[in-house]
């Protein structure tokens, strides 16, 4: 008798998401949004908390192990520079895509009555200065960044730990083995937690749809739709072409392989919480473990393609609401500010809103305009987080291919 083929985890995650949408719509039409917040969302929150508690050990041990695996501090620097350049280029493209799309649709946006605009209130968080960001990257306390999950200092600690082991030669070998063992243990725990992803996804999606269902079909539906068109265009065009021509991989195989991470990001709205799943997906698709361990945690902190599209779309929309016509110079300023802000606000809580406040300030728009879209920010966040982690994965695969080819050239040269 032939055994029934079991459904894969990605299939169960997808089923969980669809079931959550259906259940959420039922609860929304029944007016039971508060019920889902009180009784269903907490189960999803437990799942997200379990993922988040792994983030610091995953980043610390995976980056340290990745640096040690690279075996050469020059190679660490080379991989870091390539990664940073790739992230900056895709972020700039994301802003351009967002601006092009929102300008195509801006004729459909109507200015809000002055009475409504006068009632808007939004307290913007102050964005740190560039020098303050640089200073904060280097921690004065070893444990504080880990306790507060401040990822940039944790990344710096991990890089120094790995570099210190490499510099110690044979004496550092035992520490290298310990770090490798710790990473293995953390990854096993991660795999246990990932098994509960379908349940977590179902609970989170149910609550999001039940609570925001009315808002989705409200007057902000058009701007949400424009943002999501931008997300899809960026994924299909920029990432699809990157995977095909830079990573030398079938885009279909890539999207199939990255699906579990995308669904997890869509429901948790956290790049850091999705990091363990993303690392697992990339390694299965052929990324070099030492590269994915280095590139993905870095990307989860500084790569914000989805957020960049969101900045561009929302800035033009808010300008239209105030009846302000943005010039070509303003558009160029949005591209520059959104691209640089993705690094400038890296690791800062509420980075999306802080970045948008910076963009609005640069082009002379009232920061209070953020209040127009703040109510449905969760809907924007689901798409932009998904885009952010997908970009991280394309980078890991691309850098892995470059490093494999570099190693092959060295081997061929040595064989001569």
Predicted regions and their residues:
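Juxtamembrane helix-boundary/capping and inter-helix hinge elements in multi-pass membrane proteins
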Residues: 68-75, 110, 168-173, 181-184, ...
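Transmembrane alpha-helical segments and their short flanking loops
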Residues: 312-416
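Signature of multi-pass transmembrane helix bundles
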Residues: 4, 10-14, 21-33, 48-51, ...
């Amino acid at each position: 008798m032939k055994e029934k083929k079991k459904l894969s985890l990605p299939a169960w995650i997808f089923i969980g998401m669809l079931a959550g949408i259906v259940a959420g719509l039922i609860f929304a039409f029944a007016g039971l949004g508060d019920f889902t917040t009180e009784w269903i969302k907490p189960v999803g929150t437990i799942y997200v908390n379990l993922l988040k508690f792994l983030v610091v050990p995953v980043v610390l041990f995976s980056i340290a192990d990745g640096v040690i695996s690279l075996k050469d501090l020059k190679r660490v620097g080379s991989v870091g520079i390539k990664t940073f350049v790739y992230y900056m280029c895709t972020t700039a493209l994301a802003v351009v895509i967002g601006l092009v799309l929102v300008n195509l649709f801006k004729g459909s946006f109507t200015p809000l009555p002055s009475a409504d605009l006068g009632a808007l209130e939004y307290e913007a968080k102050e964005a740190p200065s560039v020098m303050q960001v640089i200073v904060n990257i280097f921690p004065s306390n070893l444990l504080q960044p880990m306790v507060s999950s401040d990822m940039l200092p944790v990344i710096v600690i991990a890089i120094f730990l790995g570099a210190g082991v490499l510099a110690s030669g044979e004496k550092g070998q035992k520490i290298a083995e310990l770090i490798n063992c710790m990473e293995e243990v953390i990854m096993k725990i991660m795999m246990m937690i990932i098994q509960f992803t379908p349940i977590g996804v179902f609970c989170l999606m149910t609550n999001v749809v039940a609570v925001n269902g009315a808002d989705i079909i409200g007057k902000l539906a058009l701007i949400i739709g424009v943002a999501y068109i931008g997300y899809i265009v960026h994924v299909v065009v920029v990432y699809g072409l990157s995977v095909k021509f830079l990573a030398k991989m079938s885009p279909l195989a890539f999207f199939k392989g990255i699906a579990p991470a995308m669904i997890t990001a869509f429901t948790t709205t956290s790049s850091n919480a999705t990091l363990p799943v993303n690392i697992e997906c990339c390694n299965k698709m052929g990324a070099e473990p030492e590269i994915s361990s280095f590139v993905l945690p870095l990307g989860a902190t500084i790569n914000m393609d989805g957020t960049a599209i969101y900045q561009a779309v929302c800035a033009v929309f808010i300008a239209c609401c105030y009846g302000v016509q943005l010039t070509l110079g303003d558009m160029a300023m949005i591209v520059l500010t959104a691209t640089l802000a993705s690094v400038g606000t890296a690791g800062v809580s509420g980075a999306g809103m802080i970045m948008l406040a910076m963009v609005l300030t640069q082009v002379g728009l009232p920061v209070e305009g953020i209040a127009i879209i703040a109510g449905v920010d969760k809907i924007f966040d689901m798409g932009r987080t998904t885009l952010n982690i997908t970009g991280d994965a394309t980078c890991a695969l691309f850098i892995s291919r470059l490093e494999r080819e570099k190693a092959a050239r060295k081997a061929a040269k040595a064989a001569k």
